[in-house]
């Protein structure tokens, strides 16, 4: 569908937005947030709620948002998730079909220390997040990102949040090849 997107994932609170916005400034790419494109605040009573009632519905909204936003001749960094918590607080993979439609040039994954992520989320959202669920979510994102990279035959760059600016170096090589 698209041919000018790099997808960067990571769990809530790992620092994706900050890192991705920095990379976009550095590489003159356009920053896109999956939650903004699918208008999360319109479909959820509590925008800080991390559980998703209908994951396929939200992901279809993402594709619609991308279709209405993406322009030829521009390069985009889309920040989102490989997996989400469903309404039962179970980890659920985003369908590979969604990634096929996004058609990213490369994948990035930002990992973080779960204790730091939990602390950041607890403060930001004024909630007490479950350490085990956050760890399970991050582990699931790592495994699934590797699966997607192999299935889509595109590179995956994995970085720790405290050293994720290396991601910029990897992406600049892809970006400069265009």
Feature roles, as predicted:
Residues 80-124:
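ATP-dependent NMP and nucleoside kinases share a basic, alpha-helical "lid"
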Residues 8:
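Hydrophobic anchor at the beta1->P-loop junction of P-loop NTPases
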Residues 127-167:
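Small-molecule kinase domains that catalyze NTP-dependent phosphoryl transfer to phosphate-bearing small molecules
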Residues 15:
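Conserved glycine(s) of the Walker
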Residues 12:
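The conserved Walker
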């Amino acid at each position: 569908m698209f041919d000018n997107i790099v997808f960067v994932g990571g769990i809530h609170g790992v620092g994706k937005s900050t890192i991705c916005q920095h990379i976009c400034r550095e590489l003159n790419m356009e920053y896109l947030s999956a939650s903004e494109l699918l208008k999360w605040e319109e479909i959820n009573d509590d925008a800080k709620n991390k559980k998703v009632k209908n994951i396929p519905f939200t992901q279809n909204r993402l594709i619609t948002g991308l279709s209405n936003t993406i322009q030829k001749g521009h390069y985009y960094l889309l920040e989102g998730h490989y997996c989400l918590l469903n309404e039962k607080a179970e980890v659920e993979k985003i369908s590979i079909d969604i990634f096929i439609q996004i058609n990213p040039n490369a994948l990035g994954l930002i990992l973080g220390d779960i204790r730091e992520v939990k602390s950041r989320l607890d403060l930001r959202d004024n909630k007490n997040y479950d350490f085990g669920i956050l760890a399970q979510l991050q582990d699931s994102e790592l495994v699934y990102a590797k699966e997607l990279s192999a299935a889509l035959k595109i590179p995956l760059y994995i970085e720790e949040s405290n050293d994720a600016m290396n991601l910029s170096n990897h992406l600049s090589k892809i970006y400069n090849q265009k």
